[in-house]
């Protein structure tokens, strides 16, 4: 009997150990499964973070491209506006004929000199005809200049103005106040509000 009891105790002990091993294996399996789930979750989160970062980068690149396109279009529009402004500027409209006017003014000077010479001729009739023709030519030229906005500067009898007059000499005079223009050697001209040439004048000064 004693021998039989001893033989039965062995299987009971082995069964307990086996049950404990199975429980341990089950626990380890559960732990591994949980770790696997956590690893999978972390991987999914990492992939999602990478995807979000890629989306953000793509969005930034698209935004940068939009800003660049806007900048280029704005720059092109500004350049077009600048060119139009250059073409249409009032400055150009007002002073575009300045070179032509400067070329015509010496012709008027020559006509004035011719008119002065005819006064001393011995043939009154010829002198009168020549004078009339020259005067008519002068009037026509002045009309052309006036059409383009050119006017003569008023000088004789005016107070000397360095903005419009250039004094070549000063002459003593009891009849005029000091700094009064009493003679004009060469006429001055304005193109609208711009000085083309000052008038060359003599001004009065009081006697010492």
UniProtKB/Swiss-Prot annotation:
The keyword Cytoplasm applies. Residues 1-27 have a biased composition (Basic and acidic residues). GO terms for molecular function: adenyl-nucleotide exchange factor activity; protein homodimerization activity; protein-folding chaperone binding; unfolded protein binding. GO terms for biological process: protein folding. It holds the Pfam family GrpE. One of its GO terms (cellular component) is cytoplasm. Keywords: Chaperone, Cytoplasm, Stress response. Residues 45-64 have a biased composition (Acidic residues). It is found in: Cytoplasm. Gene3D superfamilies: 3.90.20.20, Head domain of nucleotide exchange factor GrpE. InterPro entries: GrpE, GrpE_coiled_coil, GrpE_head. Residues 1-65 are annotated as: Disordered. CDD domains: GrpE (cd00446). Participates actively in the response to hyperosmotic and heat shock by preventing the aggregation of stress-denatured proteins, in association with DnaK and GrpE. It is the nucleotide exchange factor for DnaK and may function as a thermosensor. Unfolded proteins bind initially to DnaJ; upon interaction with the DnaJ-bound protein, DnaK hydrolyzes its bound ATP, resulting in the formation of a stable complex. GrpE releases ADP from DnaK; ATP binding to DnaK triggers the release of the substrate protein, thus completing the reaction cycle. Belongs to the GrpE family. HAMAP family: GrpE (MF_01151). Homodimer. This is Protein GrpE. It comes from Desulfatibacillum aliphaticivorans.
């Amino acid at each position: 009997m004693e021998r039989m009891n001893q033989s039965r105790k062995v299987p009971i002990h082995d069964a307990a150990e086996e049950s404990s091993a199975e429980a341990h294996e089950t626990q380890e399996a559960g732990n591994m499964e949980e770790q696997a789930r956590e690893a999978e979750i972390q991987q999914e989160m990492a992939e999602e973070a990478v995807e979000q970062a890629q989306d953000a980068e793509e969005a930034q690149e698209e935004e940068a491209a939009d800003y660049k396109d806007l900048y280029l279009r704005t720059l092109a529009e500004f350049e077009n506006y600048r060119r139009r402004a250059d073409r249409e500027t009032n400055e150009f409209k007002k002073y575009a004929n300045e070179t032509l006017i400067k070329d015509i003014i010496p012709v008027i000077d020559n006509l004035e000199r011719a008119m002065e010479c005819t006064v001393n001729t011995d043939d009154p009739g010829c002198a009168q005809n020549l004078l009339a023709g020259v005067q008519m030519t002068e009037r026509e030229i002045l009309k052309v200049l006036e059409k383009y906005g050119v006017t003569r500067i008023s000088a004789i009898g005016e107070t000397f103005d360095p903005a419009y007059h250039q004094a070549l000499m000063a002459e003593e005079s009891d009849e005029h106040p000091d700094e009064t223009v009493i003679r004009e050697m060469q006429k001055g001209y304005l193109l609208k509000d711009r000085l083309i040439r000052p008038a060359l004048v003599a001004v009065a000064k009081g006697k010492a």
